[in-house]
Amino acid sequence: MSAEKNQNKTRKLFAPRDPEEAQRAATPLELLFDLIFVVAIATAGQQLHHAIIEAHLWHALPTYVMVFFALWWAWMNFTWFASAYDNDDTLYRCLTFVQIVGSLVMAAGIPAVFQEHNFDVIIIGYVIMRLALVTQWIRVAKHDPERRVTAYRYAVGIVLVQLGWLIGNFSAIHMTPLLFLILVLAELAVPLYAEKYAVTPWHPHHIVERYALLTIIVLGESIIGSFAATQEAFSNHDVNFKEIFLVIGGLLMMFAMWWVYFDRSHHHHQRRGVQPFLWGYGHFFIFISIAVLGAALAAAVDVSTQHAHISSQMMGWLIAACLAIYSTYIWLFYEAFDLSGWRRWLYPITILILFTIPLFFADIGYIVFVMAVVYILRLVIAKLYLNNCNDKRMAAST
């Protein structure tokens, strides 16, 4: 009986999932995929950390953005596909495992990208992941007649763009920033084109949960990275107040960013049409700002202990830029067009203040701590004002 059940699971039709399925949650396989992906994100963060303290920031940042996009885009494709078609059969699990192997190959190639601008290994890993995904879309074309054209559009689009990556890297053309940008735009265009025919049945609540989980994972990885740098620095000399302020400030920043993200509902941005694309694509700035902030805080420890070749002021502006990018996304999607009065402008005002703080403090520890206090004050003021408005509405209604 159990053998027959296993055989049925192996041969299960690759039918679409119900987008209104109750209590849809992330699967253990999806969580494993996320955790493996953190290895690649952590590797990229370590490379950026070392580049920052060696004063190679402007050379390393574009490279980091390129690497992070490749990682994030592979995660994006897997996540949205799984939301619509994860049937957890044997072949699906095996193809997901192939994608996991591809992500590990990508992680192995990250140091060469930073040190030699060599994308060979990372693109090989990318090809492994994409071939597995194309196979999944071909399965969809076979088992979901309603969206067969959509599935073929995805499969063909992915193959064509992947050929562009291969030609751009392994031919005489070479991978230039302009070519990279063109290929990125092509990658982003594939889902827009494919979904025009028939929208895949992704699950709104499941997608929101998947994005939230990755946000927590990237936050956690950033905290671990900065903590490891702090632990190493503190083991080599006596701790002073400046470094204590730096550690407290870094933790407060991460806590405030977590609070800001999870203090609001993301589900109303999951309506059909173009808005889910803006919401989903826009999260790139959420994830990369958190990841860069983690590397920056780790580098800030080296600045504080005088083991870096970058100034406290420059480090402060890098950290302010991370908070600004993160806050701008939150502001545009949740406050700029939904709030009225002065509360609408709390984020822009906070961002301006953050960029001025490095002008008034000479040590990175104080800079980080004051930035964290300012960011938390914005959160407190917004919460107090909101609660006050809610109390007034309740009093008026009674």
Where in this protein do the model-derived segments appear?
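Short acidic, Gly/Ser-rich segments with clustered Asp/Glu that frequently serve as metal-coordination loops
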Residues: 37-38, 49
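Short, hydrophobic transmembrane alpha-helix segments
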Residues: 45-59, 83, 112-113, 364
